[in-house]
Regions:
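Conserved N-terminal entry element of GNAT/NAT acetyltransferase domains
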Residues: 1-42, 196, 202-230
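A conserved beta-strand-loop-helix scaffold within acyl/acetyltransferase catalytic domains
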Residues: 38-41, 51-109, 113-116
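Hydrophobic alpha-helical core bundles mediating ligand binding, dimerization, or RNAP-core interactions
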Residues: 47-55, 131, 135
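Short, high-confidence coil segments that cap the C-terminus of an alpha-helix
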Residues: 84, 139-141
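Catalytic cores of nucleotide-enabled group-transfer and carboxylate-activating enzymes in metabolic
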Residues: 87-89, 133-136, 154, 173-176
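Conserved acetyl-CoA-binding loop-helix of GNAT-fold acetyltransferases
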Residues: 121-136
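Conserved beta-strand-loop-alpha-helix junction that forms the acyl-donor binding cleft
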Residues: 144-159
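Conserved catalytic-core motifs of GNAT/GCN5-like acyltransferases
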Residues: 147, 162-182
Length: 230
């Protein structure tokens, strides 16, 4: 549709300059190689095709996480959110997980959502760790605000990382009181939780860049239902 670019200049929020996230490869528990790379805006329509069926799965609050993630990615695609980014995990080209967040300012980051489309392999945990790696090591932020919407998210983020509770502080997503990750906490947790190798072998990177393959909806539902791994 045609755009009134003069009006768009008013409607589009400020965007901070963000260095790219360098891709890496993670060996999953089943021996498969997951390429973690940064999405570009043009990837959003393909990513949304994987997120959409998850919106109707109640297990572990997949419905609310997926619905919010869908809206956040669409807002990024339509230039309606400030300084958002998205990282994704691919196995043999298939999209198996998505994480996103944004910069509140140059010092403070907002963690948005973590969605594992293939369960039982710690894909969500690996992608969350990659997201924190991006905020702390590459964006050089002083803190990342995090809130959980599910019990498993609380265990994976707040407990595993020993996050600091921020009494009286409301995360952008609403919900419970926000927690934060600081560089000190990140580097303390990094040896246990942040994994992956760089550079990605050329054949694996080429396969990931070639296409974002979306699994059929019934297969996505089966994966989230607890059947291990692609």
């Amino acid at each position: 549709m045609p755009l009134d670019m003069e009006l768009e200049a008013v409607l589009r929020p400020h965007q901070y300059e963000m260095p790219p996230y360098p891709p890496k490869v993670i060996t999953l528990a089943n021996g498969k190689k997951m390429v973690v790379r940064q999405a570009v805006r043009e990837d959003v329509p393909a990513i949304l095709k994987s997120v959409h069926p998850c919106m109707f799965i109640e297990r572990d609050y997949y419905d609310i996480v997926s619905a919010r993630l869908y809206g956040e990615l669409l807002a990024w695609y339509r230039y309606r959110v400030k300084s958002e980014y998205c990282l994704m995990g691919q196995v043999d080209g298939y999209l198996v997980g998505v994480v996103n967040g944004r910069l509140e300012n140059e010092k403070v980051g907002m963690s948005y959502h973590t969605l594992a489309i293939d369960r039982g392999l710690r894909i969500g945990a690996h992608l969350f760790a990659s997201k924190m790696e991006y905020h702390i090591e590459y964006l050089k932020q002083e803190e990342v605000w995090i809130v959980a919407e599910s019990p498993i998210g609380f265990r994976r983020w707040m407990i595993e990382y020993g996050l600091e509770l921020m009494p009286g502080t409301q995360h952008q997503l609403g919900g419970a009181t926000s927690y934060r990750l600081t560089p000190e906490l990140y580097y303390k947790s990094k040896p246990r939780l942040v994994v992956g190798d760089r550079p990605v072998p050329p054949d694996l990177m080429a396969r990931a860049m070639e296409d974002i393959i979306v699994a059929p909806e019934d297969e996505i539902a089966e994966k989230i239902g607890g059947v291990k791994g692609r």
